[in-house]
Amino acid sequence: MNNVVIRTEFLCKSFGKLDVLKDISTEFYQGEVVAILGPSGSGKSTFLRCINLLEQPTKGKIYFHEQEITNPKVNIAKVRQQLVMVFQHFNLFPHMNVLQNVTYAPIKVKGINKQKAEQHGLELLESVGLEEKADVYPSKLSGGQKQRVAIARALAMEPEMILFDEPTSALDPEMVKDVLEVMKALALSGMTMAIVTHEMGFAKEVANRIMFLDQGSLAEDATPGEFFQNPKCDRAKQFLEKML
């Protein structure tokens, strides 16, 4: 059990009378790359947001290692330092340059020395191919560059797991490849990742596992080979016919 990073037990989320997540029980293992697929409105993003408690589950439990993080007494801010999220729309600070965006949280939240944080920040920007943009402000960057900065910012916290919420869906098609290449390199480095995505080729190539959500339920949990070649449920078959 000790290499399980996240475990969910009978996770439910409702908005009023709408049941968005229904009894999702699953585990994410260290070093695993899980692609979360499904039609629009199936609960994928809500599930991801529940994992680091940006959304409070209506019922059920979430464990980070053996700690129940749905317990109200848990310091959620501390947990989120280890479970960082990369959003669809980047969410960079517009009044800070690229390097300041990357180093802000390590300095303010973790108390890391500014010089050390900046050195690490420049290394991370180099790893995403943007070291020459360190002094540039977000308004001068393309969407793909902004998303790569957002990934560097997430990595600056040295997290245990990164949650990606449709990281390429707001990008122009020609920008998608650069972001996916960075994510692929991250996967190869052993980073634990959960990725809500519509990029089927990427999911097939990079993920170790596919979770397919439909109407808030975990309809299928399989290897990419099993899911793409021989999906079990009819809804997954219909989904793949449209997407591939």
Range-by-range predicted roles:
Residues 3-224:
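ABC family nucleotide-binding domain
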